[in-house]
Amino acid sequence: MRFRIYKRKVLILTLVVAACGFVLWSSNGRQRKSDALGPPLLDAEPVRGAGHLAVSVGIRRVSNESAAPLVPAVPRPEVDNLTLRYRSLVYQLNFDQMLRNVGNDGTWSPGELVLVVQVHNRPEYLRLLIDSLRKAQGIQEVLVIFSHDFWSAEINSLISRVDFCPVLQVFFPFSIQLYPNEFPGSDPRDCPRDLKKNAALKLGCINAEYPDSFGHYREAKFSQTKHHWWWKLHFVWERVKVLQDYTGLILFLEEDHYLAPDFYHVFKKMWKLKQQECPGCDVLSLGTYTTIRSFYGIADKVDVKTWKSTEHNMGLALTRDAYQKLIECTDTFCTYDDYNWDWTLQYLTLACLPKIWKVLVPQAPRIFHAGDCGMHHKKTCRPSTQSAQIESLLNSNKQYLFPETLVIGEKFPMAAISPPRKNGGWGDIRDHELCKSYRRLQ
């Protein structure tokens, strides 16, 4: 009798466990199905611990992370499921390349200009850029590609409201956010920035053999911008399907730029002038950082100069031919010890490109840098103040905008320009090899 009672209890318990298991399995199955059928998680919050500052051109600064005490190398952490889901989603979105604000008949093709905006995590400035685009004449003809290295609900919401031009979003697949605890992010086994090489070798940190030119070890947040820029350059020219046979120009912007309402009007006239009077010009730029109070007498003039990274890195426009010459310099770009993409380009004009770059640039700028604060500046970020100053300048000169013709104002002597100095931050062989690999990625 005791044996039969015990058997009955075991049977009942088994049935209860089986029923609970079935309920849990059904619940998970429904969730998986919901995830599979639901829209992409473009409005999801960023991965934990992924907040990083944007990097601008300037001198490399010591971050608070560098002051961490020395600790022995630790085992590599496991990747959490949320991070893996984001990696998978980024891959899928980059493959799908869903265009918005175009017809569904499959006949749409880009015009003579495409904009590519490198976006990090400054939505307050991105909002200003989008507002300036909205005011630009002819913008409905221009494809705008937003290239992201940070995923946030606020940023994606901003871009979802762009209804005035064709839009494509792509995502840098090797961001710190997608690799928060391993390379290309910050691996806990990496050497601390200021550790001497001998001490690093004794400690056994994984990049001990590869400090930069100043004896410092890599900091992921400084390395990311150069990685993103080079990946984006290759991806838009080689992997964006709608641009496979594109013969126009691509204008490269950043999230803290601001465009004049006649930028597209002026750009088209610059391109025509380049073809007619400056066939030797390699690139176009929409402006410099020089402070201008009045457009009087200069609104219809452009100059021919030697390209200089500290002056002509805003609104840089490249043809496919210029891109192909750049990509042939992949090894030089990817191994030059400077974490700034533009100062590295300056080095390429001396060390690798067939000749120094000749740039066509307007005397009255059609692009402005609204984000003159942040990592390399001590100013407080006040986007509304900066945008008000730019709008005031444009309003006070609106009678000079949209010139009927453009003429070359000055042709400056062409002379090689060396980078002011090498900033370092790019000595790690892992950065070199990842950077080189973008050319091989499908």
Curated annotation (Swiss-Prot):
Give the record's membrane topology: Single-pass type II membrane protein
Domain of life here?
A: Eukaryota
What compartments host this protein? Answer: Golgi apparatus membrane
Q: Which cofactor does it need?
A: Mn(2+)
- What if the gene is knocked out? Decreased embryonic survival between 9 and 15 dpc. Surviving embryos are about 20% smaller than their littermates by 15 dpc. Most of the newborn pups die during the first week after birth, and none live longer than 4 weeks. Pups are about half the size of their littermates 8 days after birth, have dismorphic facial features and severe locomotor deficits. Pups display impaired muscle development and defects in bone development including a hunched spinal column, plus poorly calcified and brittle bones in vertebrae, ribs, femur and skull.
The residues exposed to the Lumenal compartment are: 30-442
- Residues binding Mn(2+), per UniProt: D256, H369
What intrachain disulfides are recorded?
A: C191-C205, C278-C281, C329-C352, C334-C435, C373-C381
Describe, from its UniProt entry, the tissues in which this protein is expressed: Detected in liver, lung, testis, kidney, brain, spleen, thymus, uterus and intestine.
Q: What does this protein do?
A: Plays an essential role in protein N-glycosylation. Catalyzes the transfer of N-acetylglucosamine (GlcNAc) onto the free terminal mannose moiety in the core structure of the nascent N-linked glycan chain, giving rise to the second branch in complex glycans.
Protein name, UniProt field: Alpha-1,6-mannosyl-glycoprotein 2-beta-N-acetylglucosaminyltransferase
* Higher taxonomy: Eukaryota, Metazoa, Chordata, Craniata, Vertebrata
The gene behind this protein is Mgat2
